[in-house]
């Protein structure tokens, strides 16, 4: 089964912006396949969907992509209907939006995108678009890494689809130290911990170069100690001038009811650049 990009389109202008990412990522697949799905849940008239789908179809013709446009009735909830319409497993890379919900519910908590990320049925990338003028083509990316022994494997499908050979990729390891403890670390201890972070990032960089047919020509490593994980990611993103942050999601890290204290929600809320939250099946 050929890999494909699946765009979950809710009929909004935000989904049109996410579509730019979907088009560019589909162009990087061998089969160049894009599937666009809208579920008729009553929030958007069918008449509003038709011109948006027509615009995507024209872009697919222009880019030489194989495009499938689907409008499906609602069965159960929107997330379940979307999952039923797409091929399950690692062959599908589902893109959806992450935009602020009504009544201060946050960007992911309680949304269709959160349920897709939690589903575990396919690769999912929820994108918050801050700079639509990038047209889904960020040139500088920041990948914060948690130091998991599996290295970069969970992020690799998204790296291969997003990072062009001319892109600048920043690998970031933020090692969290408590506020009180951070101020009392000796210089030698701090250097030793940072060295461990750089060792981990070196292994990840080697893995990227080994697996990518055309790895990014600029691959840089950054290891820091900080008391505030989310805050440090935002600081580093600003300092490095990145155009997109990619963050891995887990069942534990995804917001459900708690919004304001959740680090993913905080980054989505305070970011000055595009953000992608990814999860693999």
Language-model-derived ranges and their functions:
Residues 24, 41-43, 51, 58-94, ...:
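Structural beta-alpha unit
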Residues 18-21, 48-56, 81, 196-207, ...:
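Short, solvent-exposed amphipathic alpha-helices that sit
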Residues 96-115, 119, 136-138, 244-270:
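Glycine-rich, Arg-bearing micro-motifs that act as flexible, cationic patches
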Residues 95-98, 124-130, 248, 275-280:
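Short beta-strand elements of ligand-binding domains
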